[in-house]
Swiss-Prot record:
Positions of region (Disordered): 42-79, 163-444, 475-650
Composition bias, Basic and acidic residues: 246-256, 361-373, 401-417
A cellular component term, taken from the record's GO annotations: collagen type IV trimer
Entry keyword set: Collagen, Cuticle, Disulfide bond, Glycoprotein, Repeat, Signal
Low complexity composition-biased segments: 306-318, 563-581
Domain of life: Eukaryota
Pfam families associated with the record: Collagen (PF01391)
Family note: Belongs to the cuticular collagen family.
Subunit and partners: Collagen polypeptide chains are complexed within the cuticle by disulfide bonds and other types of covalent cross-links.
Function (record text): Nematode cuticles are composed largely of collagen-like proteins. The cuticle functions both as an exoskeleton and as a barrier to protect the worm from its environment.
Glycan attachment positions: N446, N535
Annotated protein name in UniProt: Putative cuticle collagen 99
Organism for this UniProt entry: Caenorhabditis briggsae
Chain intervals for the UniProt region annotation (Triple-helical region): 142-201, 230-263, 268-296, 394-439, 479-536, 538-576, 577-636
Length: 686
């Protein structure tokens, strides 16, 4: 409402549309009205005094239990929303330093040339650049200011919902090791063990005993009498050993032996290299190869003074290039090539006269010439003599012709600067312009300068600036005082290597240098002309330089077979061969003698447990244990609390006494005798 009245007053007073500042002020007032209507915002001064009362006051929630009414009709479309608040400074895109320097350079150009056209100023305003209040400078919209101070303390909120069940806590530290347990009962006797291994064979039969003495002669035959038989005499000496017994039978076949240990790898180590074989029989001579086609031209090396010798063939295709020859031997410390013949003179230039060039610039004014010689005196005119011989002067003659225009004088000195003129009258306000196009943001969402802005600056704004700057340079513009030197810019990236420039002009001839060292000997000269003075031959000259390497000759015939070579050294032993196949099964051996009795085997493993015995008599109950720890607290349901009501069963926070409570006594009265809850419990003791 306030915004509407404000707009009406503005329209009545000015008769025009609202300006941007009035519109923003109207939106701010509307926002305050809406906030005051929707929320009861207490005054700022009394927020601390009434904070406790507001916190204690609590509205009744869910007090209305009526069913919801039918949905209403859709309301009219509301007014356009208010502009959003500016983003905090830490969420705004940051402009890189290079982009800031680019904008600052443009602003400096605008500051330097202030008298610009109106079309340029409109485009500058579209890019966020504004004139200063006095109209003498151009300003750039600055960065947003720091965040304002913190607002007053808000009202105390309603109690929050209970949080969800927490996660399991971390695993505790390991406990102390327990005491050693009592010794267990002895287990049952295990089954008999497996038979032990077969014993070793006993020692062979010992040596024969010594032969005893011959028997004594027999005594006389006794007579049977009635005499009593005396006690037995002492044992006689041992008798001679009897004859050796026969060999016993072969013993039974023994049990199968235990499996042996795993053998080594089937593939043995690599053997030594064998001896090299003898050289083979030399092969027979091969057939001669076909002759190649003749080449076209073979140029030889150049002789002194550029004379070359060549051999040209009339027919034949060019053969393949031969292999490179051996490098030549140079006997001089530095090989210098022979200077070639002079080149063919070029064609003479064209004699056609080209078109006449453009007229040259006007030359400067020449110096003033010297003063000419004085002319001869003129002839005196005819004078009339009157009265005493005096000459009478006649009437003045007609005016003479205009003289020649004088020469231009020298340029005068600069005059003093005039006073500043009075300000002109204020012009009438112009007509309202058309609505401009949508502006372009200076900074892109990613924090860099907008590419569309760069294109507009290059295509539209920069050409206009260049034209106006070129016009201002020709006028009498008095430059202002030089500004302070700016900070040193960052080093730019190294540019790509440029193209090679044209060859420069020959330099000036330098001073004559010092005498150099003696050079190497020159090449041999041409042979001199033979003189016919006599048959005497001159002295023999020095040997010439080695000639160029000759061409490679044809392939020679294959050589004779060589003699057989000597016997080579023994080679390294070869690798071990693969394991051979299994042999055939051998014949069954003879039955061996019976072996001695084996030793008792080791104790066998423990047998399986026996069947469960009969249950024993129940023991006496143990002593009462210690009191347990406190239980885990109950879980809170994640739901809002309901309104406070009458006490209900199992929901009241007040503990109830089972003997004195009225509700408990009524419940017990309604229950039958069999379902009544016993008040005491008895424990059976043995």
């Amino acid at each position: 409402m306030c915004c509407y009245l404000f707009q009406q007053r503005e329209r009545e007073r000015k008769g025009t549309l609202l300006t941007g500042e009035a519109y923003k002020l109207c939106e701010t007032i509307t926002l305050l009205d809406v906030l005051q209507i929707e929320q009861d915002i207490p005054p700022i001064g009394n927020s601390d005094d009434n904070s406790d009362d507001v916190a204690k006051s609590r509205k009744v929630r869910n007090s209305c239990m009526c069913p919801p009414g039918p949905p209403g009709e859709r309301g009219p479309v509301g007014p356009p929303g208010l502009p959003g608040l500016p983003a905090p400074y830490y969420r705004r895109p940051r402009v890189p330093l290079s982009n800031v320097v680019f904008v600052v350079v443009i602003v400096i150009v605008f500051f330097k040339f202030q008298n610009l056209d109106e079309s340029i100023s409109r485009k500058m305003r579209a890019f966020g650049m504004l004139y200063s209040p006095d109209g003498q400078a151009i300003q750039l919209r600055g960065m947003p200011g720091p965040p304002g101070p913190a607002g007053p303390k808000g009202l105390r909120g309603y109690p929050g919902f209970p949080g969800p069940i927490g996660l399991d806590g971390p695993r505790g530290l390991p406990g102390t090791p327990g005491s050693k347990g009592e010794r267990g009962e002895r287990g049952p006797v295990g089954p008999p063990g497996f038979p032990g291994p077969k014993g070793d064979r006993g020692v062979m039969t010992g040596p024969f005993g010594v032969h005893g003495q011959h028997p004594a002669p027999s005594g006389p035959i006794g007579h049977h009498t009635t005499m009593n038989i005396g006690p037995p005499g002492p044992p006689g000496p041992p008798g001679p050993p009897g004859p050796a017994g026969r060999d016993g039978r072969h013993g039974m076949k023994g049990d199968r032996g235990l499996p042996g240990f795993d053998g080594e790898s089937k593939i043995g180590p690599k053997g030594e290299t064998g001896n090299p074989g003898r050289d083979g029989i030399p092969g027979a001579r091969g057939p001669p190869g076909e002759r190649g086609e003749k080449g076209d031209t073979a140029f030889l090396s150049t002789y002194p003074r550029g004379q070359s010798v060549s051999t040209v063939s009339s027919s034949g295709s060019q053969g393949p290039p031969g292999p490179p020859g051996p490098p030549g031997v140079c006997q001089v410390s530095q090989c210098i090539g022979v200077q070639g013949p002079p080149g063919i003179p070029g064609e003479p230039g064209r004699t056609i006269i080209g078109p006449q060039g453009p007229p040259g610039e006007k030359g400067e004014r020449g110096e003033r010439g010297e003063t000419g010689d004085k002319g001869p005196p003129g002839t005196p005119g005819a004078a009339s003599l009157l009265n005493g011989g005096k000459a009478l002067v006649g009437p003045p003659g007609p005016p003479g012709r205009d003289g020649r225009p004088g020469e231009k004088g020298e340029k005068g000195e600069h005059g003093l600067r005039g006073d500043m003129g009075l300000p002109g009258p204020e012009g009438t306000p112009g007509k309202r312009g058309r609505r401009g196009r949508h502006g372009i943001s200076l900074v892109a969402p990613n924090g860099t300068i907008n590419e569309d802005l760069k294109k507009l600056l290059k295509t539209e704004l920069m050409p206009l600036l260049i034209e106006d700057i070129s016009e201002l340079r020709g006028k009498n513009v008095i430059p202002g005082p030089p500004g302070p030197p700016g900070p040193r810019g960052h080093h730019g990236p190294i540019g790509p290597a440029g193209e090679r420039g044209p060859q420069g002009l020959p330099g000036h001839s330098g001073e004559r240098g010092e005498r150099g060292d003696i050079g190497p000997p020159g090449l041999p000269g041409q042979p001199g002309a033979a003189e016919s003075s006599g048959n005497q031959s001159g002295p023999r000259g020095p040997p010439g330089l080695p000639g160029p390497p000759g061409e490679k000759g044809d392939l020679g015939p294959p050589g004779l077979p060589g003699q057989p070579g000597a016997l080579g050294l023994p080679g390294h032993p070869g690798p071990m061969g693969l394991r051979g196949p299994h042999g055939t099964e051998g014949k069954q051996g003879k039955q061996g003698p019976e072996g001695p009795k084996g030793y008792p085997g080791p104790m066998g493993p423990q047998g399986p447990p026996g069947n469960d015995g009969e249950p024993g008599i129940d023991g006496r109950p143990g002593p009462a244990g210690e009191k347990g720890d406190q239980g885990i607290p109950g879980l809170d349901a994640p739901c809002p609390t309901g309104p406070d009501g009458l006490p209900l069963p199992y929901c009241s926070w007040k503990p109830m006494d089972g003997k004195n409570d009225v509700w408990e006594r009524r419940k017990r009265a309604t229950l039958p005798r069999s379902e009544s809850v016993p008040e005491e419990r008895t424990y059976i003791k043995n």
